[in-house]
Regions:
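Residues lining hydrophobic/aromatic ligand-binding pockets adjacent to catalytic sites
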Residues: 1-228
């Protein structure tokens, strides 16, 4: 079976991690020309004011021709400190935050040079905490998307900012099922820190699921993704 092809992602979404939970291996695109305004360098968390986007400042060493593997991080502003403070403020009341916070903080404070290195470290952190056994490899060459897209090509579906969250051009099929392009994702509700204020917010960064459900998160991941 052909392994799914994904883009890299910063603090990847529940749907992203759900795909990994259902497969023995995936391939992550690194040879593409880096696209703007996607979840390759941003993540969504739930705060007391609603959904907050965490944006990672990046640098294109070769301008518009820079590949994803060449993208570096800018530390002109202390974004990593701001992100961590936002995460603490959002999840300090979550049941499992104290169990998982130290290692995540360490990764964010390491000042990685490349975006791909940061994302890879965060991805392996989540794989370990969710107890997901999925081998990660990276592309050697760029393969353009086909039309219609291959069922295993998820590079756009899982990281396009217009299709990740339920209020961004998605079609709601039921209370917890949403259609992203040709795929249907069912997001079983789980307790969240601010659910009495905003209701259930599906498909945030997977740290939302981790901090709220802890060791009970993996069964929910297995209910989230479609079978590819």
């Amino acid at each position: 079976m052909t392994p799914p092809l994904l883009s890299t992602a910063y603090l990847p979404s529940v749907a992203y991690m759900a795909v990994l939970a259902r497969h023995d291996s995936v391939v992550i695109e690194q040879k593409e020309t880096f696209p703007k305004q996607t979840f390759r360098n941003r993540a969504a968390i739930a705060t007391g004011n609603g959904v907050l986007m965490l944006n990672v400042p990046v640098v294109r060493p070769y301008g518009n021709h820079t590949r994803t593997e060449q993208m570096t991080l800018s530390y002109n502003e202390p974004w990593h400190i701001r992100h961590w403070r936002a995460i603490v403020a959002a999840y300090s009341a979550a049941p499992y935050f104290l169990y998982y916070r130290d290692e995540l903080e360490k990764i964010l404070m390491q000042r990685h040079e490349r975006l791909l290195d940061l994302n890879d470290a965060l991805l392996h952190y989540l794989l370990k905490k969710f107890k997901i056994d999925c081998q990660i490899s990276y592309t050697d060459n760029f393969t353009p998307p086909t039309a219609p897209p291959s069922p295993t090509d998820l590079r756009t579906i899982l990281t396009n900012k217009h299709t990740l969250l339920t209020n961004k051009s998605t079609h709601q099929l039921s209370d917890s099922t949403f259609q992203f392009s040709i795929f249907n994702f069912h997001f079983p509700p789980y307790p969240q820190v601010f659910d009495t204020r905003f209701g259930f917010l599906p498909n945030l960064s997977a740290i939302d699921l981790l901090f709220n459900l802890g060791p009970e998160a993996k069964p929910l991941l297995l209910q989230t993704t479609p079978i590819l």
